[in-house]
Amino acid sequence: MPLRHPRPHPVDGSDEQGPVSRFARLAASCTLLGAALLVLQFRSAGEAVPLRKSLDAFPVAVGDWQVQAAASLDPEVLNLLKVNDYVLQRYVDGGGRSLWLYVAYWATQRGGAQIHSPQNCLPGSGWEPVEASKLVIPLGASPPITVNRYLVQKDRSRQVVLYWYHSQGTDVAGEVQAKIAMVKNAFLNNRTDGALIRISAPVQGTVQETTERLIRYVQTVYPILGEYLPD
C-alpha cells in the first residue's frame, strides 16, 4: 500500500520530497551520524544525566485518562535499546477509548546507546505506514511543539501514532534535527541525554477523531513530562 502524505496539518513545504531531496536528506543524516560518532569518541568522559525523578512514578491519571495496564519491554529489547528508564502504559478515558504512552529516556548516548526511531521500529513489528505528516500542537502558554504523525496498519487494524524527541528542554520531530541537537549538546555541554515520547491509539471513530484525541492527550500530559525530563 503506497505511503500517503496528507496535507490537513502541514508545518511547511518541507514534506515535498523528490529524489534529489531524499538523497540530500540521506547524505545529511550520514554526515551527522559520522560527526556524532566522532564527538562521542573524543568526548567520552561526559556524565550520564539522571531524570528529575524515575518514570516508574509516572501518574496513573492524566486528565480524564486512567491507567488500565502497564507493560514491560523484553530483556532482549532492553539490551538492544540500552535505555536507562522508560514507562509503557495503556490509558483509557471515560468513553472506553484507549491509547498507549511510551516514554524512553537515555541518560547518555555513548557506548552504543542511541534513540531508535519508531519510523524503523514500527515496520519491524508488522505495522506498515499508510500516511505520514507533521503536526504543530499548541500548548497554551507554552510554545507549540511539532510532532510526527503516522497512520499505520497491520492486517485490518489501524493506529495513529504521534512521536517526538526531547533533549535538554528542546522538543523536535525530525531524526536529523535530533542528531543535530545531540551533536550540539555534546560539543557545548558534554551531554548526550535524550528522550523519545510516543503516543499511539487504535483508530476509534475516524482517523481525524483519533488524531484529535491524541492531540488533547499531548496537551494534557506535556506539563507532566517536564517534571521528569531534565532541561
Describe each PLM feature range:
Residues M1-Q17:
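N-terminal Lys/Arg-rich, disordered targeting/topogenic segments
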Residues R25-Q41:
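Hydrophobic membrane-insertion alpha-helices, especially the h-region
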Residues V20-A24:
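Bacterial N-terminal signal peptides that target proteins for export
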Residues K53, N84-Y86, I145:
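Short beta-strand-initiation
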Residues F58-R90:
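Short extracytoplasmic
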Residues S44-V62:
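Alpha-helical transmembrane signal-anchor/signal-peptide segments
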Residues L88-R216, T220-I224, Y228-L229:
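A cross-kingdom signal targeting lumenal/periplasmic-facing segments of multi-pass membrane
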